[in-house]
């Protein structure tokens, strides 16, 4: 991408830093990770969790959610102004699972948000450490991406369920900053914009007055984020049209849906980061690892290394398959929900199966589920190889637009050939090329029709042995190309509902 010169790297976004060199970036990301780890250890002490209980992923998620809730300024303010029955705006909590007499017991805990904020700041050298909070949000988002399908949300905004591979980060909160914006898929941004436009259509005052001015600024900012994800001039020009519209309405919604469809072939650039549960960082810090001194990267070997020697447990329901639960969490850890299953399987060294074939529900346990029958097992989060995370859409030719992989948003920078029936996607583009954006639409369709799926994406990029930390000798896998491995096809997973 030619225009990337002014952009900050992810790690800079992640840590709010200005331009830094690699060492400084690794140190500041390390500082962020170390802070999460120290916070987790302190929380385990406060809650008197045993070593085993501290490694339970469900406990980790509760602790992460508590600190995210404690720092959610807007919601805290809202809760104080609209007191609801039985909700103390100053407290936060959740289920903590303890092992008592060979059984798992659920205990609901409640803490002062002020106290949680104090513990978090103390673990982060007295700072608010927003980067660490965003990091945990992205981990939760990646877990949701691997666990739930967003068919209903897609249909509600007038999009097509086949666009599910564009929905990365669709459950990230608005407050997730630049690092959050980087990991949002094209479909997620389109959906946020459509919701906004629909509100404007239904509510005459949405764009008016002082509030309306702020709304407008947010709208244009979101348009620019989405524009930055597209890699062809025609798609970007169309985004300019949407952004500059005086009074956004149905024409803009049409344009956005058109752009989302086009992203199935002309993939947008979406960042991928390996964000791990807080307990993993806690374990490493507790065993004496100094993240800031050693440095850390979210897109290199470091997360793989960490998972190689961390033991994390999970509660398992009576009819769930522990191996499937492990796959779900592994995919979440590497932000691989939208990656080609063949690539994931090769890196993991175990077959990664489509979601419809998993015998496992989500990781979190609902408050009405029976604990009597709960068991726990070790999550197998190790991998055979490691690979660099990408933020390109995997289009084969950056100079002139070409095809990325349909139904897949690549996570790993690993060579793969592109099995791909362009006809099936092109069928979605019959019909409307009228209106203000007709020339751009025609141009985008022309690019897609001429986009040859060249032989391979990420040519020459391979995976690395876990001993090869400097990534010196890539192993380029060869895949059986009879079918494209999308995780979502033939799917019957449950929906994500807030």
From Swiss-Prot:
Task: Give the location of motif Unconventional nuclear localization signal in residue numbers.
Answer: 1-18
Q: Where in the cell is it found?
A: Virion; Host nucleus
Question: Mainly resides where?
Answer: virion
Q: Where is this region: Disordered?
A: 1-23
Regarding how it is modified after translation, the entry says: Late in virus-infected cells, may be cleaved from a 56-kDa protein to a 53-kDa protein by a cellular caspase. This cleavage might be a marker for the onset of apoptosis in infected cells or have a specific function in virus host interaction.
GO CC terms in record:
helical viral capsid; host cell; host cell nucleus; ribonucleoprotein complex; viral nucleocapsid
Q: Which InterPro entries match?
A: Flu_NP
* Keyword Transcription part of the UniProt annotation: no
Q: Does the keyword Ribonucleoprotein apply?
A: yes
Q: List the ranges annotated as motif Bipartite nuclear localization signal.
A: 198-216
Q: A Pfam family this protein belongs to?
A: Flu_NP
Q: What is the documented function of this protein? A: Encapsidates the negative strand viral RNA, protecting it from nucleases. The encapsidated genomic RNA is termed the ribonucleoprotein (RNP) and serves as template for transcription and replication. The RNP needs to be localized in the host nucleus to start an infectious cycle, but is too large to diffuse through the nuclear pore complex. NP comprises at least 2 nuclear localization signals that are responsible for the active RNP import into the nucleus through cellular importin alpha/beta pathway.
- So what family is this one in? Belongs to the influenza viruses nucleoprotein family.
Q: How does it assemble?
A: Homomultimerizes to form the nucleocapsid. May bind host exportin-1/XPO1. Binds to viral genomic RNA. Protein-RNA contacts are mediated by a combination of electrostatic interactions between positively charged residues and the phosphate backbone and planar interactions between aromatic side chains and bases.
Protein name (database record): Nucleoprotein
| Protein species of origin | Influenza A virus (strain A/Swine/41/1949 H1N1)
């Amino acid at each position: 991408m030619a225009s990337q010169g002014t952009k900050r790297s992810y790690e800079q976004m992640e840590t709010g830093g200005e331009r830094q060199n690699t060492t400084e970036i690794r140190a500041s990301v390390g500082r962020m990770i170390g802070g999460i780890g120290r916070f987790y250890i302190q929380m385990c002490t406060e809650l008197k969790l045993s070593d085993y209980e501290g490694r339970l992923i469900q406990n980790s998620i509760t602790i992460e959610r508590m600190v995210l809730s404690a720092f959610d300024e807007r919601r805290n303010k809202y809760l104080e102004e609209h007191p609801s029955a039985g909700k103390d705006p100053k407290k936060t909590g959740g289920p903590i699972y303890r092992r008592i007499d060979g059984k798992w017991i659920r205990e609901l805990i409640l803490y002062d948000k002020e106290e949680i904020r104090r513990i978090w700041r103390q673990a982060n050298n007295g700072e608010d450490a927003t980067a660490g909070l965003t990091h945990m949000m992205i981990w939760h988002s990646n877990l949701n991406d691997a666990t739930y399908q967003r068919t209903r949300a897609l249909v509600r905004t007038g999009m097509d369920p086949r666009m599910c591979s564009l929905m990365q980060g669709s459950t990230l909160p608005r407050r997730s900053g630049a690092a959050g914006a980087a990991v949002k898929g094209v479909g997620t941004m389109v959906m946020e914009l459509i919701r906004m436009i629909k509100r404007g259509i239904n509510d005459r005052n949405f764009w008016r007055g002082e509030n309306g001015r702020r709304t407008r600024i947010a709208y244009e900012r979101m348009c620019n984020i989405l524009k930055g994800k597209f890699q062809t001039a025609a798609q970007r020009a169309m985004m300019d049209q949407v952004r500059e519209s005086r009074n956004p309405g149905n024409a803009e919604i049409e344009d956005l849906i058109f752009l989302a469809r086009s992203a199935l072939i002309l993939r947008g650039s979406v960042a991928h980061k390996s964000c791990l549960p807080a307990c993993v960082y806690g374990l490493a810090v507790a065993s004496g690892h100094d993240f800031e001194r050693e440095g850390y990267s979210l897109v290199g070997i470091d997360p793989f290394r960490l998972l190689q020697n961390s033991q994390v447990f999970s509660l398992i329901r009576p009819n769930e398959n522990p191996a499937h639960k492990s796959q779900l969490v592994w995919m979440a850890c590497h932000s691989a929900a939208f990656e080609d299953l063949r690539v994931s399987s090769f890196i993991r060294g175990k077959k990664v199966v489509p979601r419809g074939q998993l015998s496992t529900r989500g990781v979190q346990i609902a408050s009405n589920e029976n604990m009597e029958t709960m068991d726990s097992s070790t999550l197998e989060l190790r991998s055979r190889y490691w690979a660099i995370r990408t933020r390109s859409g995997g289009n084969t030719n950056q100079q002139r637009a070409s095809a990325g992989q349909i139904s897949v948003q690549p996570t790993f920078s690993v060579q793969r050939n592109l099995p791909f029936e362009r006809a099936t996607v092109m069928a979605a583009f019959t019909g409307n090329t009228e209106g203000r954006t007709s020339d751009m639409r025609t141009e985008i369709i022309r690019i897609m029709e001429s986009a040859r799926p060249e032989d391979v994406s990420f040519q020459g990029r391979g995976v690395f042995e876990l001993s090869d930390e400097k990534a010196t000798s890539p192993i380029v896998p060869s895949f059986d190309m009879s079918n494209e491995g999308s995780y979502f096809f033939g799917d019957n997973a449950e929906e994500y509902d807030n």
